[in-house]
């Protein structure tokens, strides 16, 4: 990459000190003209790299991977490479555009899909998908519906993928019974002396301990299939075409691993169909939006196009409830352990987050019959 005109000094900080070295190892077209931080992600360091080749401009996403969170980066990259290659083949066969409809890894000059710099940091690069935007909040029902279609379509395209080839990048990430076990230990150890002050929140979790293993038991017994799952199905992990308003591509594949589609569905509902912010202190503002819930079910099942089993569809409301309960349990566990995992911005922040999740669970329980009725409707 001779003739560089980019000043990397502004972004070459901390663990990203070797960004110029890393950028020079990938097979980009043209000469770099700009490199700046990009997006709202908190885990990896993400940059937009722009290049010029004659009159043509090209854009790439360059990422330094967080190997504290993802401790098997090689396995993670094998997952992403395998899944995106498979998706590309399916998309081409169905007449789609693989450069817009799935992530495309850019190889290094050594023919790999990642680079380890001289300080030991792991880097990767993707083609940048133009004329597409991500949304951090559900601004319109249609956008939530489009994201649901995208995640459902992702499930359908990968329904024959050999799941056994996937590495579990974060072991037991959505294993609710194990999360419950961790929570119980945190209560028992009470490392920070906080348990007495949250006895009602602890009781809320304990009252639902019989439900914790409902989906995992079905998965372990073969009652529902083990599938390729995304495991971070937030709205902002779907790109929406800025002209047509339709979903284009599912992104952020770091947590792609074996799991259940029921939990992928449920985590989207937890995040997107809540009428309040995740850390809302006024719990009267927290509720499940049934119109958003229905829009998401409709989009998800349309995207799946019949690839889910009847047992999976019946469990979708449980996915929503258990993902919300699990998330609240994780926030409360972290609060009891001294706020070591989730970043906090005020005293009691994790407790506020836990209370919000539990309030959402309570509202789901009030609306349970309607949640089940909507899941049973025929959308396709």
Model-derived segments and spans:
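Active-site activation/catalytic loop segments of kinase-like enzymes and analogous catalytic loops
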Residues: 262-306, 322-341
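ATP-dependent phospho-/nucleotidyl transfer catalytic cores
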Residues: 3, 10-13, 29, 36-40, ...
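All-alpha amphipathic helical-bundle segments outside canonical DNA-binding/catalytic cores
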Residues: 308-320
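Long, compositionally biased intrinsically disordered regions
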Residues: 364-367
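A short, low-complexity linker immediately N-terminal to eukaryotic Hanks-type protein kinase catalytic domains
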Residues: 21-31
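Conserved ATP-binding subdomain of kinase catalytic cores across diverse folds
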Residues: 34-38, 42-188, 258-261, 272-273, ...
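Conserved active-site aspartate in kinases
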Residues: 252
